[in-house]
Every structure is written in C-alpha cells, then in structure tokens.
C-alpha cells in the first residue's frame, strides 16, 4: 500500500500550495 502525505510549499506571504504525494 502507498504512504501518502501533504507536501506544502509557501509561494508568498499569504499563499500556500499543497499537493498529495504517494
């Protein structure tokens, strides 16, 4: 089975982008 987690990157002082990596 895959282990998944959220990878978040801060792209500005008020914005974040997140994606799920498996």
Swiss-Prot record:
Main location as per UniProt: secreted
Post-translational modification: Contains 2 disulfide bonds.
Cell location: Secreted
One CC-aspect GO term: extracellular region
Keyword Disulfide bond: yes
Coiled-coil stretches noted in the UniProt entry, renumbered to this chain: none
Keyword field contains DNA repair: no
Tissues expressed in: Expressed by the venom gland.
Keyword entries, A-Z: Disulfide bond, Secreted
Function of the protein: Not lethal to mice by intraperitoneal or intracerebroventricular injections in doses up to 150 micrograms.
Name the UniProt record assigns to this protein: 2.4 kDa venom peptide
